[in-house]
Design a protein with these regions (language model features):
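Surface-exposed cleft-lining segments at the edges of enzyme active sites
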Residues: 36-37, 137-139
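Transmembrane beta-barrel outer-membrane domains
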Residues: 22-24, 40-46, 85-93, 141-147, ...
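Predominantly the C-terminal beta-signal and adjacent terminal strand-loop region
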Residues: 64-77, 89, 141, 150-199
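Bacterial Sec-dependent N-terminal signal peptides
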Residues: 1-30, 195-199
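Short catalytic helix/loop segments, enriched in acidic residues and glycine
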Residues: 46-54
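Gram-negative (and chloroplast) outer-membrane scaffold detector with strong preference
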Residues: 23-27, 33, 54-130, 189-199
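Outer-membrane beta-barrel translocator domains and adjoining extracellular loop/strand segments
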Residues: 39-45, 75-82, 124-132, 176-182
Length: 199
């Protein structure tokens, strides 16, 4: 009984060791700044910072779950406009990305990624009508708590650790909360220039 148990455990250890040698895990940190299609007549900016754990399925393919903080905000140098509310917001994103690596590990080449992203609202904006302080929308939250979308990206890897490219967020959900006087819809999208450090 003990011999069978030991042999079974040794066999499992050998499988895990060989599996670990065939597949590589890679840590990724990314930082991005870009623009977002949040306002009708005004450009908004986006900022993101995140971490991903990249698991290589094969030489050119990997899957990378991760977590990141993403903020969408107005031009910080514009100043407040009387009678116009701020519509800034931020999210914790949880993407699960499939990546294709054109090159061998640690070499120069392109990387393309695509996958679903689950977004959880961390800061909201509220409505405010300066011309009518009694408006029923005043102080009510604008956005829903959850969004679902996809996250495409393309990068150029310069060597063993650094990748530079473009990453986007495409939201599928109408993020505006339902109120009797609100008939609009708003999907949150952004594109960001991104730098990625991996090891």
């Amino acid at each position: 009984m003990n011999r069978k148990f030991i042999i079974t455990m040794l066999a499992l250890c050998l499988v895990f060791v060989s599996h670990a040698q065939e597949h590589k895990i890679e840590h990724n940190f990314n930082l991005g700044v870009g623009v977002a299609s949040l306002a009708k007549n005004d450009v908004h900016y986006s900022f993101r910072i995140g971490y991903g754990l990249n698991y290589y399925l094969a030489e050119n393919w990997s899957v990378m779950p991760g977590v990141s903080y993403r903020a969408v905000f107005e031009d910080p140098f514009k100043g407040d406009v009387v009678g116009v509310e701020s519509d800034d917001c931020s999210f914790i994103d949880v993407p699960v990305l499939l990546q294709y690596h054109q090159h061998a590990r640690g070499e120069k080449g392109f990387v393309a990624e695509l996958g679903p992203v689950f977004s959880f609202l961390t800061s909201n904006s509220t409505y405010y009508t300066d011309a009518n302080p009694q408006d029923e929308l005043n102080d009510k939250k604008m956005y829903k708590n959850f969004d679902f979308g996809i996250q495409p990206g393309v990068y150029y890897q310069t060597g063993k650790h650094w990748r530079f490219g473009v990453q986007a967020h495409i939201g599928f959900c109408n993020m505006l909360k339902k109120y009797p006087s609100i008939n609009d819809s708003k999907r949150l999208n952004d594109v960001a220039a991104t730098v990625n450090f991996s090891f």
